[in-house]
Structures are given as structure tokens and as C-alpha cells.
């Protein structure tokens, strides 16, 4: 153990003078995965687990990549807004689910409410009811491999430039959803469910 590392403390007991909690300092996430609380400042190049490829460290690496891409997108949008280039596109407010019983299996119709009005139901998508129930059933499924995670990020990166400039809000929402999935997976790993 290096001199600036200490065994992981849950923070149940206040530290500092007069029992007051000291301000929260950033700790190395990789060290935290392996049971140590190491201050982050000046530590990145010397981290023992810098090249660790365990499941938790791989998840942290993916989360860091996604968050970095999200921050870059936010900065780009702010810069475009300052220059007067950015034109926000209204996103769907809510999805309305309609159930239709017909044929052998029941189906759900997802409609997104938006400001555009069309006479044809092109914005509606038909899916089977079993497909809607899959995320709840897959809650305890094994986590995706790093190759699958890479393919997910590659799919986001493969969006053509026209889509990114025409609909920056759409890409931002996709990245936010990916971050939420990574955070959920991280939480499940910490709980020992995976």
C-alpha cells in the first residue's frame, strides 16, 4: 500500500476537527473498486490498477468514455449556441402506449407526441407485448461483454454527420441513456447481482 492510500472507508464516522465531516475529495474509481481510497490529485499516472481489465474497471473505462463524449457534445452545443448556429429541435414529450387485442397475440402501439402533425401513422411503431417486458426480465441477465459495449458505442459513433448536426438533442439523449445504463450496471455490480 502506498503512503497516500488508505483502506476503503465508508464515511460512517466523521473525520476532522470537532467531529465535522471534511469536504468531499475526489477519489480514484479504480482504487475504490479494489478496496482503497486514494486521493485523485496527481495519482492518475501512478495508479496501480491503471491497466486493470477486470469487469468493474472495464465498466468504469466505458463510463468515462461516454461521459467525455457527452461533455464534448455539451461544449459543442454551447459554442454553437453562442455563435447563433444552434437551433433546438423539440423532442417527444411522452410516449403513449395503446393496447390492441387482435389476432393471436396482443400488441402494443407506441406513439410519441410531438409538435409535428401527420395524417399517416408513420410515427407509431408496433411491437409485441413480450418485447416490452424483456427489459424487466433481463434485469438480472449477465452484463454485456466489453466487445458488446464497444459495439454499442460504435453504433453511436457511426451516426452520420448530417444527423448529428440536424438533431443534436437526439444524440445527447442517446448518450444520456447509455450513461444511465452504465450507471445501472455499475450499481448492480456493486450490489453483487451480476
UniProtKB/Swiss-Prot annotation:
Keyword hit for DNA damage: no
Pfam families with a match to the protein in the record: DM, Dmrt1
GO MF terms held by the record: cis-regulatory region sequence-specific DNA binding; DNA-binding transcription factor activity, RNA polymerase II-specific; metal ion binding; RNA polymerase II cis-regulatory region sequence-specific DNA binding
Polar residues bias spans: 1-13
Keyword tags: Developmental protein, Differentiation, DNA-binding, Metal-binding, Nucleus, Sexual differentiation, Transcription, Transcription regulation, Zinc
Residues annotated to bind DNA: 28-75
Main localisation: nucleus
Segments forming a coiled coil: none
Location(s) in or outside the cell: Nucleus
Region Disordered, annotated ranges: 1-23
GO biological process, one term: negative regulation of transcription by RNA polymerase II
InterPro entries named in the record: DM_DNA-bd, DM_DNA-bd_sf, DMRT, DMRT1-like
Entry function: Transcription factor that plays a key role in female sex determination and primary ovary development. Acts as a sex-determining protein by antagonizing the transcriptional activity of male-determination protein dmrt1-a, acting as a dominant-negative type protein.
Similarity-based family: Belongs to the DMRT family.
Protein name: Doublesex- and mab-3-related transcription factor DM-W
Species of provenance: Xenopus laevis
Amino acid at each position: 500500500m502506498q503512503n497516500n492510500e488508505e483502506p476503503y472507508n465508508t464515511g460512517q464516522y466523521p473525520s476532522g476537527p470537532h467531529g465535522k465531516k471534511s469536504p468531499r475529495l475526489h477519489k480514484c474509481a479504480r482504487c475504490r473498486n479494489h478496496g482503497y481510497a486514494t486521493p485523485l490529485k496527481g495519482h492518475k499516472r501512478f495508479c496501480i490498477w491503471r491497466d486493470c481489465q477486470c469487469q468493474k474497471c472495464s465498466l468504469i473505462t466505458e463510463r468515462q468514455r461516454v461521459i467525455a463524449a457527452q461533455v464534448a457534445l455539451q461544449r459543442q452545443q454551447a459554442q454553437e449556441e453562442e455563435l447563433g448556429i444552434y437551433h433546438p429541435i423539440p423532442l417527444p414529450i411522452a410516449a403513449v402506449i395503446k393496447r390492441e387485442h387482435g389476432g393471436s397475440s396482443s400488441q402494443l402501439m407506441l406513439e410519441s407526441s410531438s409538435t409535428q402533425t401527420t395524417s399517416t401513422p408513420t410515427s407509431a411503431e408496433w411491437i409485441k407485448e413480450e418485447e416490452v417486458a424483456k427489459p424487466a426480465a433481463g434485469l438480472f441477465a449477465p452484463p454485456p461483454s466489453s466487445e458488446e459495449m464497444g459495439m454499442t458505442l460504435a453504433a453511436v459513433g457511426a451516426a452520420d454527420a448530417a444527423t448529428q448536426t440536424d438533431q443534436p438533442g437526439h444524440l445527447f439523449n442517446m448518450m444520456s441513456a447509455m450513461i444511465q445504463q452504465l450507471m445501472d450496471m455499475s450499481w448492480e455490480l456493486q450490489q453483487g447481482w451480476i
